[in-house]
Amino acid sequence: MKIEELPSGSYRVRKMYKGQTYTLMFDEKPDQKDVIDYMAKKMKEANVYTKTFEYYAKDYIKSRSNVLSPSTVQTYERLINVISDDFNGLKLSNITQADVQKEINRYAEDHAPKTVRSLHGFIATVLGSYRPQLVLKTTLPQRIIKESYLPSEDDVKAILNAAKGTEDSIAFQLGVLSMRRSEICALSMDDLIGNELHIHKNLVWYKKWIVKETPKTDAGNRTIYLPDTLVQEITEKGYFFKYSPNKLLEHLNKYQDKLGIPRFRFHDLRHYFASYASTIMPEADAMALGGWKSDYVFKQVYRESMRDKRKESAEKYINNILS
């Protein structure tokens, strides 16, 4: 049995077993017993996970169907179908880092980096659940940062004014107050007590539209304060928004087109909230109102929403220096 010390300080052992050579890695120099014990462990694992990756992927989803959100279950089921037959057919115990890298390379040929990362995340999750000893170090495509149009204060006010008195008025105002589409569409009148609106559920699609009683994150379970004018409007109408999240975006797009405003996502109203709220209240309060779980995510949103202002400041600085 030959033991090689590598430049990294690790030790490598190549061991022949039943006509097949196995490469074993150790952090410290092993003795013969260490090698035998490790080989026995590997053989046991190989005998446990004898079915295919596809089998264990479906088993993972089934075993967690009561705790995963419907949208997550739907996404995972879709991802199984886009994985190649070759990879889905691999015996779980035989899957190597090279197999995963090959599958990711194949998928990355005609898919966006974000989609590729989602697929890898699912594969890694399944492998991590059944073979936690397999540590993946897959090379993934670099993220592409797209500069989408972000609404200005004038854009937001124009849309709110145009929507006054319509069935969209309440939903648009709630969007400016940081609410997500799925949260708005799940609201019922008993969520409003006085001026306080309790946000604790989402309308999500899983074969049909269903109300999910738990929020997207723990921070999503929150209470926000509504002004008297908005409370009165909600009380008089007796509802918040009658349609689906998809319809809410369609309605927003109609106003954007009518007013000559570049299209942006309904979610970008949260970005507007982040930039504005950060100027008038402590960061912790803004995060709590918007339901951001971490300051990292909040700051990412805030930095993106302030992009145009940074550009304006940079241009002003350059013009002053060079003029």
Predicted regions and their residues:
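N-terminal DNA-binding recognition helix of tyrosine site-specific recombinases/integrases
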Residues: 82, 90-105, 109-139, 179-182
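Basic, Lys/Arg- and aromatic-enriched nucleic-acid-binding interface segment
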Residues: 113, 133-187
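Conserved tyrosine-mediated DNA breakage-rejoining catalytic core shared by Y-recombinases
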Residues: 187-233
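Short, basic (Lys/Arg/His-rich) helix/loop patches that form interaction surfaces
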Residues: 161, 236-296, 316
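Short, surface-exposed polybasic/aromatic micro-patch for ligand or macromolecular engagement
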Residues: 1-49, 217
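Catalytic-site neighborhood detector that most strongly recognizes the C-terminal catalytic loop/helix
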Residues: 150, 203, 283, 290-316
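A Lys/Arg-rich helix-loop hairpin that forms a DNA/phosphate-binding surface
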Residues: 45-58, 70-74, 84-105, 241-243, ...
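Short, aromatic/basic-rich helix-turn unit that serves as a nucleic-acid recognition element
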Residues: 18-21, 52-80, 107-112
